[in-house]
């Protein structure tokens, strides 16, 4: 059986990892062994945070809607319940946008929710 030397493949793999680690601090961008661990960990963080981003944005939207709803004299949960009863199907992302940029329209939605709750 012939001896297999893996110089080309190993170099290619090392180059690939070091390219991914470009911009990392110190040995993390220069030493393959350290860079490999850093790249693996970065991938784990990226995977986790792609899921967390969705949660965090929803939390932000809810906080903004709650603040705007309370300025109009209604709590977030009662406001959402009122919108459901009034069969207004606007998602939280759009509601938060309306709350920040169009106060008049948001006030109209609050009034609609209050009427549906009464």
Swiss-Prot record:
Q: Which GO terms describe its biological process?
A: ribosomal large subunit assembly; translation
According to its UniProt record, what is one Pfam family this protein matches? Ribosomal_L20
MF terms (GO), sorted A to Z = rRNA binding; structural constituent of ribosome
Q: List the disulfide bonds.
A: none
Which SUPFAM superfamilies does this one have?
Ribosomal protein L20
**Cellular component, GO, one term:** ribosome
Q: Does the record's keyword annotation contain RNA-binding?
A: yes
Keywords, alphabetical: Ribonucleoprotein, Ribosomal protein, RNA-binding, rRNA-binding
Family label: Belongs to the bacterial ribosomal protein bL20 family.
Provide the function of this protein: Binds directly to 23S ribosomal RNA and is necessary for the in vitro assembly process of the 50S ribosomal subunit. It is not involved in the protein synthesizing functions of that subunit.
Q: Per its record, how is this protein called by name?
A: Large ribosomal subunit protein bL20
In which organism is this protein found? Edwardsiella ictaluri (strain 93-146)
Q: Which gene encodes it?
A: rplT
